[in-house]
Swiss-Prot record:
This is Vacuolar protein sorting-associated protein vps901. Disruption phenotype: Results in mis-sorting and secretion of vacuolar carboxypeptidase Cpy1. The keyword Amino-acid biosynthesis does not apply. It comes from Schizosaccharomyces pombe (strain 972 / ATCC 24843). GO terms for molecular function: guanyl-nucleotide exchange factor activity; small GTPase binding; ubiquitin binding. Keywords: Ubl conjugation pathway.
Length: 572
């Protein structure tokens, strides 16, 4: 650095000296012109000091610029490191869903649902209030026939109410948010498992109960779609412009099996999982075999899989899911796959020659063959039905034959005595048909501690309460004791419990314990069966791998079928 030639005044501040050095070294205009008057020299110096206080020197500015540049470089380096780390984490993560180039393919890795744990928690003494709320609701719900819209309203209102109670009572109140969410999922599954025969249209039809207009429409649409799928079961991949690959048949069969399992489960969540597994198997095929993913390729394969699977009651299943699955869960990936399946069903229902890659002559020939097969099947079913009726008519149960003549007079007398009361009771019972026809139902007491309004000594009271629950009443069909009502604004209406005979109470408790044990055993059985079926399906797709290896992969992927397929494809 070139120092100035004149002597520096030690009383001047460093910034002034630096500015003077700069002016002299760069041979700029002198700070003070000695030819000027003393006042002009003083003004020039004051102006310089004023400007110097407001503006930093060039050296300071350079130092600040260098510091800013260093900070930006350091920040940029940190950002690059973070981006690289996120990229590595993403690559190392077990991605068990299709890529993000499709709006419906993004999945949130939710915690594994443990229904068995929820049932164990519900049996604990601290959860007794929640169990009583549940028992009361189920008891009251099954005493009436509700319209579909009112069924949906009652169940959603109860689940909202009971979810608030789950957060208030142990063992969930002090648990983690994951345990609370698991309990809410478990409660929805438990409620809909118990009420399945009253909510699922084919189950109602099977019981012989007259159907409401909505349930009747479900059953009729099931029949139409089933006949369409049978009519077009001859369709091949080429007819839908699907490029056939070496391993496509294994993937399509596995996807069809997953979709067909939708009728094995009662909870909407479980039915959705069957649909998701079906769709994810298809996307695994596109990703790993075809090496290309798009909705244009996914939809034709889904249509082909539906035709191959031909699942029964598909329309009723979709309606059941939309009605009773929590609306907060019907979003994102689930809604995408659900709407895509509905589009595939609509395509099948309106399918004609122009929808396929096929000549009109071949199309008509295949349709004629299918119609002939369908007629032969119906004739065979009628013949088998007549044979079964004849066999039942000729068979006589020796036990019933011995006791029939001796008991006929007594049973007839009892029936005649009770007939007026039964006819009177029928006037107060309703069914959810558009014509509001009355539906006969027995009003015998159930002997439950939560059925106080249906005691033997209060027939009129029973009928009065019967009417109150049906229609537009805002009162929910559940009743709890005052001891468990913690909030007047959110709790159901409180009723005093009627005294119940100890023997009836013991029988009721035994029945509840037996039901709970059966539900636990059923949950364990389904879990074991799902694992065995998944291993069998994966062995069929990957015969080169040992069963132990497949099981290890399945366990590592927490039972997720599609991610297990991806892992095995990478290993092969």
């Amino acid at each position: 650095m070139d120092y100035p030639s004149f002597h520096e005044d030690p009383t001047k501040d460093e910034s002034t000296v630096a500015e003077q050095r700069k002016g002299q070294s760069n041979e700029e205009k002198p700070l003070i012109d000695l030819n000027d008057s003393l006042d002009e020299q003083r003004n020039a110096y004051n102006e310089h000091c004023k400007n110097h206080d407001q503006q930093p020197s060039q050296q300071v500015r350079n130092m600040e610029d260098e510091a800013n540049q260093y900070e930006q470089t350091d920040s940029s380096s940190d950002q690059e490191v973070m981006n690289e780390k996120q990229s590595l984490d993403k690559e190392n993560r077990n991605d068990n869903i299709p890529h993000e180039n499709n709006p419906g393919q993004q999945e949130i890795n939710e915690p594994i649902f443990d229904f068995h744990m929820f049932l164990e928690q519900l049996r604990s003494s601290s959860a007794e209030p929640v169990a009583k709320y549940l028992k009361s609701f189920l008891s009251e719900f099954t005493k009436r026939r509700w319209t579909v819209n009112y069924q949906v309203k009652l169940i959603r209102d109860f689940l909202k109410f009971i979810n608030e109670k789950i957060e208030q009572y142990e063992p969930w109140a002090s648990g983690s948010q994951a345990e609370i969410d698991n309990a809410k999922e478990g409660m929805e599954k438990l409620v809909l498992n118990r009420l399945y025969t009253s909510l699922f249209s084919p189950e109602i039809a099977k019981s012989g109960i007259p159907l409401s207009s909505e349930h009747s429409d479900d059953v009729e649409e099931d029949r139409v779609l089933s006949e369409k799928m049978e009519l077009f079961q001859w369709i091949t991949e080429e007819n839908l412009d699907i490029k056939k690959q070496k391993s496509s048949s294994k993937f399509f069969k596995l996807a069809a099996d997953e979709l067909r399992r939708i009728n094995d489960y009662h909870a909407p969540r479980d039915k959705i999982i069957c649909l998701l597994n079906c769709c994810k198997v298809i996307f695994s095929y596109l990703r790993n075999v075809v090496k290309e993913e798009s909705a244009d390729m996914f939809v034709p394969i889904l249509i082909f899989v539906v035709l191959q699977a031909r699942p029964a009651h598909l329309v009723s299943n979709i309606q059941y899911i939309q009605r009773f699955r929590s609306p907060e869960k019907l979003t994102g990936e689930v809604m995408y796959y659900l709407s895509t399946l509905m589009g595939a069903m609509s395509f099948i229902e309106t399918l004609d020659c122009s929808s396929l890659t096929i000549t009109e002559e071949e199309f008509n020939a295949q349709i004629e063959k299918s119609i002939k097969k369908m007629e032969e099947r119906k004739l065979s079913e009628k013949s088998e039905s007549k044979t079964a009726v004849n066999e039942n008519a000729t068979y006589k149960d020796p036990v019933l034959s011995r006791g029939l003549s001796s008991s006929i007079d007594v049973s007839t007398g009892v029936a005649l005595v009770n007939l007026p009361e039964e006819l009177e009771n029928m006037k107060y019972l309703q069914i959810d048909t558009p014509e509001s026809k009355e539906y006969p139902r027995s009003t015998r007491p159930r002997g439950s501690s939560h059925s106080g309004s249906f005691t033997t000594d209060s027939g009129k009271r029973s009928r009065r309460n019967s009417n109150k629950y049906v229609g537009s009443s805002d009162r929910p069909p559940y009743r709890v004791s005052r001891a468990y009502s913690s909030s007047a604004t959110h709790s159901p209406i409180v009723h005093e419990e009627q005294p119940v005979d100890d023997g009836l109470q013991q029988n009721d408790d035994l029945r509840e314990a037996t039901t709970a044990s059966l539900e636990t055993a059923e949950a364990e059985r389904l879990q074991a069966r799902e694992k065995a079926e998944a291993i069998t399906a994966l062995r069929a797709m990957f015969p080169a791998f040992d069963s132990e290896v497949i099981e290890v992969v399945l366990n590592a992927q927490q039972g997720r079928l599609s991610s297990s397929i991806d892992s095995l494809l990478e290993m092969s």
